[in-house]
Amino acid sequence: MAGHSQFSNIKHRKGAQDAKRSQKFTKLIREITVAAKQGLPDPELNPRLRSAIFAARKENLPKDKIETAIKNATGNVAGENYEEIQYEGHGPSGTALIVHALTNNRNRTASEVRYIFSRKGGNLGETGSVSYLFDHVGLIVYKAEGVNFDDLFSHGIELEVLNVEENDKEGLHVITCEIKDFGKVRDAFYAKFGEPELARLSWQPKDLIEISDKELIDKLSALVEELEDNDDVQYVEGNFTFVDKL
């Protein structure tokens, strides 16, 4: 019986992993579709689409699915229309979160996001309820192993970006710029250093809260994980980071 139980657990775990992978593919396809609809179908002329395709390839989304998503978005194929919506809310202990969604039913998504917040010790707020705690900037991220920091820094100075910094913990180089300059800066870095790991508009906290309490870390992790598990939620940003106790 023990062997049977173990096999069942393995099957259950694989089923859960397959479901997560399928959900991730769905979200990637949705982002490709929206990016292609909003701009040109050529990724070299549509940076958002280029970034979406790059992210999809990293996750091994099949090429035919990428091509079909672009074709459906730019052709006369009847399909669902998605809109970008941003939700703001508080997590446990007054933490602040901004939730980014692509949805074809804003009432459904709002209801589900509100339910997750309340179930996990937080509450969904009105527009503007937490965004004042953040700066809205352009964000460009490169892996540290692939690009020399000094070269990035020098290029950033030339382009008059807000900041270029090293994130040693994550092994990343992070560039931020003014919203109005984002397109120009993103394209200039792409031309010199290739496709970044991430390039999008982002809400960066004015004051980052460092959290070391294990119970609070667990609560916030559970909240963010459940939000990002929602089919309509693309990603979540917050004003906190987890640190180890000394």
UniProtKB/Swiss-Prot annotation:
NCBIfam families: PRK00110.1, PRK12378.1, YebC/PmpR family DNA-binding transcriptional regulator. Its main location: cytoplasm. It is found in: Cytoplasm. PANTHER family: PTHR12532:SF11, TRANSLATIONAL ACTIVATOR OF CYTOCHROME C OXIDASE 1. GO terms for molecular function: DNA binding. InterPro entries: Integrase-like_N (IPR017856), TACO1_YebC-like_2nd/3rd_dom (IPR048300), TACO1_YebC_N (IPR049083), Transcrip_reg_TACO1-like (IPR002876), Transcrip_reg_TACO1-like_dom3 (IPR026564), YebC-like (IPR029072). GO terms for cellular component: cytoplasm. Belongs to the TACO1 family. Disulfide bonds: none annotated. Residues 1-22 are annotated as: Disordered. SUPFAM superfamilies: YebC-like (SSF75625). It comes from the Bacteria. Keywords: Cytoplasm, DNA-binding, Transcription, Transcription regulation. It comes from Wolbachia sp. subsp. Drosophila simulans (strain wRi). GO terms for biological process: regulation of DNA-templated transcription. This is Probable transcriptional regulatory protein WRi_002620. It holds the Pfam family Transcrip_reg.
